[in-house]
Structures are given as C-alpha cells and as structure tokens.
Amino acid sequence: MDIMPKWVDIIVVPLLSLFLAAFLAALLILAIGESPVTALKLMIEGTLLRSAGWGYMLYYTTNFIFTGLAVSVAFHAALFNIGGEGQAMIGGLGVALVCLFVPWPHWTLAIIGASLGAALFGMIWAGLPAYLQAKKGSHIVITTIMFNFIAAGVLIFFVVDVLKPAGSMDPASANFPASTHLPTFQDIASLIGFENAFRSAPANISFFVALFACIAIWYLIWRSPLGYEIRALGKSGPAARYAGVRPVKIIMIAMMISGALCGMMAINTTQGESERLILNFTEGAGFIGIAVALMGRSHPVGVFLAALLFGFLYQGGAELALWTKIPREMIVVIQALVILFTGALSLMVRAPLERFFMSIKRADV
C-alpha cells in the first residue's frame, strides 16, 4: 500500500525538490554578486516572452522528450539505461545514411525514413548491452557506459573517414539534400501570416513526432500486454517469472525500445537543425534524459513537463550567459542542482512527507 497519495508523489515532491534547487541556485547567484530576481526575470523574458525563445526551448525540449521516454521505458523494466548518449550518436549515423544515400522526393517521406533509420540503429546499439545483461549477466550500467565511448569512436570514424566530403576540413558529413530538410516552426508560422515568429529558432516538425512518441509509450506501458509484462518484471522479477513472463525477452525488448527512442532524438538535431551529421550533436541530452525520467516519474505526461522545464533551463541559461556576468559554468551548476534534487536527493523530500502521511493514518486508526 502506498504511504502517500499518488498526487503528492507526482506533483508535490517534484515541486518541493525544484524549490530547494532554486533556493540554492539563488544563494550561488548572490555569492557571485548578481541578483537572483534579475536572473529569473531575464530567463523568463528571454525564453517565454519571445517567440524565438520558445523556439529554442521547444528544440531542446524535443531532445529531452525522446531521451526521457527512453530512460522511462528502461526504468519500468528495472533497467538503468545510461547509454542514451551513445544510442543517440548511432541513431544520428542512421539518419545521415538514410538522408544521404536514399533519394527522397519530399520531407514527409524523408522524416519517416529517417525516423526508422534512427530507431533501427539506436535499437541495435541498445540491444548489444541488453543481450549481455539478459544472457551473460553483465551489468547494464557498466556496459551502456562503455558503449557510449565506443559509439563516440564509431561516430568519429564515419564522420571523418567515410562521410566527410573530399577536401573538406570541417569534421562533418555533406549537407543533406534539400528534399530531406524539415520545416521549422518559423516556416510553419509564416504560412499562416506570422513571418517574424520563431525567427532563426531551430524548433522543427520533429517536436510533433516527440509528442506522438509520448502517446505511443503511454499506450505501450499502461494499455498493452507487453507493457504489463515490462512493469511486472520491473516490480518483481520472481513474481513475474512465476506468472510466465520471460525475463530475457522483456529485457531485450525494453532496452531496444529505449535505444530506438534515444536514436530518434537525432531527427531533431541532425535532420532538423544541422541538416548534416556533425560531432557532439547530442550535447549531453542522453544524460539529461535520466533526470527528465526521474523528475517525470517515468510517466509520459511527467516526462513532457520535465522536458519543458529542462528546455527552459537550457535556453534561460543561454540568456544569462549573454546578458549577465554569470559564467556558463555556473549555469551548468544550476542545472546540476535541479538534477541533484529531483533525482538523487528526492528521498530527502519524500521521507518527511511519508512520515507526515503515516502519522495521519495512525491518527485515523
């Protein structure tokens, strides 16, 4: 039986964790001689009161939705997929190969092909450590971490030695054909008469693919027989095996779905924004996905809201670095505080609340 009401665990605990993180961040900003109120005002104005700010925030949000959902699926099977960075890198390679070597007549077909390529490559890359866990007993955390480094090497090899145009000094693939370029929010807004909206912002049509992924994962986890088996294995391995769930099958499937979602992040960054394959395009989104999944309690709605928050922090941090004396490193610290309190230290918030609700139940008895 749950000690706390569900709404307390889903809403109150994350909000209190955010408040503690914001309080410590305010103290740090004060310590370097800046005003926390001014900093917050700049973040809000630069992100929420300008359409371009919204465009950048939703661009980052798209990445975090994909990686947050990926980690959530693995969490439901009691697996810790810390290899999102590597799976996204390999997914980017899949996007590049599909866009460069398949003659697509229109972006509507190209995004389907790129999504399938990204998902397939990410799925395969996640399937390797999943097999080692399911069949050989290797710890999924260790293997996925190591596969991040291997993926980085694979990406460098393909970008520098295979896909880079002859004579180019830029470590990047050739530009994708124009028929594969995804419409940005600025393109969409201009069609309905708002030419100046989302100016120069990289947010693109892949945001709606991420929203569709939220709906699909919700249905998978809570409305399908496969989702029931994933949750059963995550809740109790022995009980799930007794009920007929095959752990090897579920571990493989859950991790491959997780890898596919991480790989699909590349349609936003590689096909949608840079329109070519570059190094370091993931920008840590695979690791941020862990915090997004933790804060969102591994539910697609929570993941979406947490991804929005981290998108706000990323774009707001860029505004602070531009308009204040707050160094970029301090902005990373502020983001780390949010991750720390919503993830690792959430028990510090949850424990007093559990004691409070336990005392209420005892009083009722």
Where on the chain are the PLM-derived regions?
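Cytosolic-side transmembrane-helix boundaries in multi-pass membrane proteins
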Residues: 1-18, 26, 235, 242-249, ...
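Short loop segments and helix-boundary regions at transmembrane helix junctions
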Residues: 2-12, 75-84, 106-180, 223, ...
